[in-house]
Structures are given as structure tokens and as C-alpha cells.
Amino acid sequence: MTYHNKEKQEVLQELNVQEATGLSSSEVKKRREQYGENRLRAKKSKSNWERFADQFKDVMILILLAAAAISFVVACVEGDPEGFFEPLLILLIVVVNAIMGVMQESRAEKALEALKSMSAPHARVLRDKAESIIDASELVPGDIIRLEAGDFVPADARLLQSVSLKSEESALTGESVPAEKDAGACPKADAPLGDRSNMVFSGCSITYGTAVAVVTATGMDTEMGKIANLLEGADDGQTPLQKRLAQLGKYLGILALAACAIIFVVGLANGLEVMEIFMTSVSLAVSAIPEGLPVIVTIVLSIGVQRMVKKNALIRRLPAVETLGSASVICSDKTGTLTQNRMTLVETYLDGETQANKLETKPSEEVKTLLRLGTLCCDGAVVFDGDKEQHIGDPTETAIVLAAHKNGMPKESLAKQYPRLAELPFDSDRKRMTVVCRMDGKLVAIVKGGFDVMEPLCTSGNLSQARLVMEEMSERALRVLAVAYKEIDKIPDEKSMMTLEGDLHFCGLVGMIDPPRPEAKAAVARCRKAGIKPVMITGDHVVTASAIARELGIMREGDRALTGAQVDAMTDSELDEHVESIAVYARVSPENKIRIVKSWQRKGQVVAMTGDGVNDAPALKAADIGCAMGITGTDVAKGAADMTLTDDNFATIVDAVREGRGIYANIKKVVGYLLGTNIGEVITVFTAMMLWHKTPLLSMQLLWINLVTDSLPAIALGMEAVESEVMTQKPKPKSEGLFAHGFGVRIVLQGVMFGLLALFAFMIGEKSTGTVAGGQTMAFAVLALSQVIQAYNMRSEHSLFKIGMFTNKKLNQAALLSIVLVLAVLFTPLRIPFGMISLSPQLYLEALGLIFIPVVIMECSKAFGLIKHQH
């Protein structure tokens, strides 16, 4: 139900309450039973045990558990104590992986808690004809409340009385200037939140004036509660990387099960023992599953997070790193994100001039006079504490005060030099403020207000030219105030104070704006170069938003600007049809923001949303990646976001995109490296079983290769430096698979190469030693060491000679350690539990020659253009 479009008496009648008496205690009790407490509902979060259980839903993990179970059964049947080592190792790997998953996913749901903390703890209420202070949670619709400057609004309420009332609503509406309120106003039913001047909203604060209001909504029914509902409803979803890895796991699982089934049938048909077939199946399952992949991807993402922290971007969810690299649209809030969230005086106009001029570093005496008069007619103040500024009061006033201060006229000094003797405070009816000061022995009345209300009060000055200048400044989204004055003989009595506001001399205009951040324009240009479309979504007026967007390069020729009301009038299909041509959305609601984000998502785009207010939180959560501001951002926005920009610098998001793209490229290298080796292992085990009914590699040997030998170089690959050209490429399409542009084919071919190499090594080893164990030892040595060397090939699609063979120091260290671990198994008693034997020096030399074959083949492929660098 809406109340802003109804007269006061009608609202009181609907809520069945009288302004003079308030609700009775019995009525309050009934309504509390009906509406509940004035609190926001908490969303139940998963326990760590539930999160731990969720880790075991992955297909790859389930297959590993099945392999462990089979190994355990075989060990029990055979009664071999050493046989239990293998299932215990697999189980340990699975549990460690699950614990890491819980650690990364278990983040507290802070958004709703932060919304709760914004609720007012107490309220001044009228009940049973008596005024009292109660806990805000006890309010019910129909309660009569009193508000004054400094109060938090405890619930949504319709104003009944107001005196010079202003409310800070930027968290809800995105407007940087406190909203003027008027109990007598009656906006239209479809008026956006920021235009409902006869309403105050829960969680906002009163910055000026006093009021009496009737509560219209409490708890989850308030505007803040609606946002809480949206936060609950917004789906966290999966990132593209999560979806692709999950899909990969399913494919590998199906492949492993199919191969195991074939081996089982072939083994039985050839009269092999069931236990031997089981153990071969376990080996095949282990070879098909890249056990270390989930953990290594997590580690690579964690490394990326550490890099981003150094660039002032704090990641809350690891997969968000990859999503950011895929971002193709950035929907950005204006206030505090693209702009400084601080009104600044940028232009002045003096009576008699032809146009407005930018405020110079060293202004003329006439401009100083304008600033002096304007400052004397301000209640706002700026307090300096070292390099920090604290702005107190109305932002337009603090802009004037700060401009005067920077030009050698601190307000404190002016107040002492020209003491204020009388005043007429600003109110919403007059829309102006008047003071009387003693200046150089004379009494001077100074009046400040909007030009439209000041023009009829002035009898001297070129007002027609001033109006033209004012209109031109307003078109450029400047907030314009006029300053006028007159000398008086004496201060009139209280009844005649209004006579001060007449027969004035027009002095000039001051133009203020919440200016763009200095670095924002360059950041927008870098986004466009990277193929990312910037879109402004704000609660501010469309003229202001469009002006800022044009200045920053967000809005270009042919682009459109829409209001929230226009978005409401469009169906989803209509919005989808026009969304690509709309650069600015103004006066939008939280629901509008979510619709805009989802419209882009339906277009197949990966959407990043930046913001700092409560009103941004639902869209931050609905977007593929939400980026909150760390300094000016509310706790609600930070709780809903995936990433926080700790310096509130819009340009930081561009650096984060660059890192995200680099990290995705590194993850792709890691996936390619691990899958290439796994495919080689599958081909080795499957082919040997089909052709010779033998197992060329035991499951223990495969686990050592996958989890020890391969994992260290894979992690180092994930630390590869970001390639220079990443920010000149377009974002990869949302539908683009992990194996696009022939990447999957190359992985399979590499797997075939490793498979043939291992089979050849097995044949040589078995023939030379006369034992299967000799063949397995030879296959292990060649496969393990050649895969370590292969990590260097995977660094880039450019030749190793072009990028420098040993320029990745982390990879050099990882490769050296992996080689040491392989040699430890080959040349120490550790080889015994791994089922290997000592080979002759001749065989070791032959193995050494075989391990460099992949390097030669890959370098030749790069040289002949078979592997092309993808732009």
C-alpha cells in the first residue's frame, strides 16, 4: 500500500490513529501480533558441516571415493597391510580437498546483519497521549513518532508536520544531497523513492529540522526490508569457471566409468582374476581424474587474490577473480563511485558578467566578496584534522564554506570578523536563508537561495542575464544558488523579519557539482579499449547523470538515458531489445537495478556491478560480480559484493579486470597441463590392458605423478606473469568453453603423445628387465619427468626461446623439487611400496633421452604455426 500519494488525514484514517493521542497500549499489542517486531529477518546460513558435505557432491570426488572403497575391499580380501596405504592416501586427498573448499566458501552472510545495524535502536513515540522513548523494534504501523536533526529514522513514516526538514537518503536513493521534506506535499502514486518528499525511510538519518510522522511500515515491509528481501532472493549462482570445471568433472567421470566397464568386460573375457581387474580399474579411475585440479585452481585463485590486494582490490569469493576477468559490462553507480560524493563549488558568476567562470586558484576580489557573503549565510561547517576534512551540515553549504577556506577566508575567522546578529533559517516554504551581519561597522542582510526564489526579491542587478547563465549552468547539471544583500539601518523586530528579504542587490551565482573522480575518465577509456561497456545506474536526476556520463565518456553519440519510471513501463523483452543502446539509468529503484543487470545477463554478457549504497546491494549480489567501495561503501554493500575496492578508486576495477584475465589464462594453462598428463595416463593404462592385459602403471604410481610430481609445476604455472596484450582483447563470450579455439584438441594430442611415450617406455623396460615391474618403473620415470618438462611448454603459446626458458623463477624451483621427488622414489627404498625396481644405467640414459621428445615436438609445432597465439 502506498501512502505518499494521500493526504495526511486520509493516511491517519487508514491507519486508524489520531495525531494528538497516538495508539493505545491495547491497540499496539494487537498490531504487534499482526505485523511482528520492527526488525529485519535473518537468513539462516549453512553450517560448516553442511558445507563440508556439499564438497562430496562433485563427480570427480565420488569416483575417487569409489576407487578408495574398491582398494580397501581388495586389501581386506588379500590381507595385505601395505594394501591399505593406497585407499588411505586417496581418502586423505579427498578430505583435505573438502576442508579447503569449506575454508574458501564459508563466509558469513553479513549483508542482512549490516542492514539490521542500520536500524535505529530507539524511537520517540506518542502512545496513550503520552510521549516516551522506546526500543525501535517495538514500533508498529500507526505509531506517531517525533524526529529531529541527528535522529535515525526508525521505520518508514508519512510526515504529519515538518519544519525545515532534510533527510540523508543517499544509501537508498544514491543522491549525494540530503532530500528536502515537506509534510504538505502529495506526490503522484508512481513517484520514485527520491521524490517522495512527504515520507521518511527506515535507516536514513535526519540532518536538519524537526518532524512529526505516522509509521506506515515496519520490519520487512519497509523500503530497507524490501532490499533485504531482494538480497535473500538474489541467487549467488556459479561462475563460468565453476560451471566449466563441474562439466569437465562429469565428462571425466563418464569417461572413467566407461573405460572401467570396458576393461572389466575384456578382463573377464580373457580369464583374468577379478582382483587384478579391480586393481586395474582403480588405476584407470585414478589416471582419469585430475585429483589435484580443484585444489590447484583454488591455490592459483588465492595467489591472484594476493596480487589484487596489492592493487587495492579485496576479493571475498575466490571464483570471483575469474568472473571479473570475463566481465563484458560494468554497471556502475554514480555517487561515490564515478564521482567524489562531495559537492564542490566549481563556478561563479558575478553580476554584470556575460557568463559563468571556473573558480580560479587565485580569484579576484569580487569573487572573494561573493564567497565571503555566501559563507556568512551558511550554517554548514568544515572541520580540519590534519589532512582530513569533516563536512558538517548541508553539502551545498559546506561546498561554499570550503571554497572560501581555500581562498584564505576560514568560516571561523569570518564569523569573528563579521558577527551574525540575526537570522531567518532556511525552510521548505521560503527555500532561502537570511542572516544579518555587522560588516565594517554597517548592518548587512545577506540572502541565499535558488535563483527562482531570489529573482523576485532583487531590485538591482542584471537579472535577465543572470537567468540565462543560471539555465546554462543547470543544463550542465550544476546545482546553482544565488547570493544577494542589502545594507539596513537596524534589525527589525521578530514580526517584521521578513522585510529583510526584499529590495536586494543581486551579487552573483555559485555553481556546485559532485565532480567526477580525476581517474574515472581514464578508467572508462581503458574499459572501452578492453571491450568492456560501461553503464551508469544512479538514483540521481537524469540531467545530472547524463552530464557526468558525457564528461566521463560513458555516454556517447547515439546512446540514451532512461529514468526508473521508463524502465518500469517496459517489459523484460522491451528492455532486452534496447538495453545495449542505454548508457545511463537515472532515478532508479533497487528493483530497476536488478532488472537491468539481468537484462544484460540474458544477452549473454558477464556483468560487473559497482556501488556503495544500501540501494546497490541487491544488484551487487545479482550481478556476476559485485564490486563495493571500501571507504564510502556501506557494510550492506560490502556484505553483498564479491569484491571491495579498498581505495574507492574506480580505476582499480580496471587493474582488477587485468589481473582477472591473467589469472584465467593461467588457470587455462594449469587445466591444459593437468588434463594433458591425465589423458596420457588413461591412454597408457587402457591401451596396455586392451593389447597386453597388463597394468603399465599402478594406482600408487599414478597418484604420486598426479599429486606430487605434476602439482608443484602446475601451481607455479598459475603464478605466470600476466601477458601484456590481455587488455587489448575483447572479453571472452559467456558461452565460450574452456577448450575453445582448438585448445581441447591440443590437450588431447598432447595426451596421445604422452600415452605413446609411456607405452614405448613400458615396452623397453619390460623387455630389458624381463619383468612387468621393470616396465612400470621405466614408464613411471619417463612419464613423470617428461611431464615436469612439459610445464615449460605450457607457459605460453609463444616459443620458449621468445619468452625466455627460465624466466619463471617459481616454475624453476617447482620443477627442481618435482625432479628430486621423482628421483627419490626411483633411487631410494621408497620404490618398494610403489612396486618399482632398480634399473640399469643404460635404461636410465634411454629414459633421459625420451623425456625431451615432447619439448622438441611442441617447439616444432609452435615454429610451424600449428599452435597459434589466440588474440
Q: What do the predicted segments below correspond to?
A:
Residues 1-728, 738-739, 752, 780, ...:
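Conserved cytosolic headpiece of P-type ATPases
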Residues 77, 746-761:
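Alpha-helical transmembrane segments of multi-pass integral membrane proteins
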Residues 604, 657, 661, 756-768, ...:
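Alpha-helix capping/termination and helix-coil
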Residues 689-700, 762-775:
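Helix-coil boundary and interhelical linker segments in multi-pass alpha-helical membrane proteins
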Residues 709, 754, 777-791:
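Generic alpha-helical transmembrane segments
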Residues 733-752, 772-777:
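Membrane-water interface at loop-to-transmembrane-helix junctions
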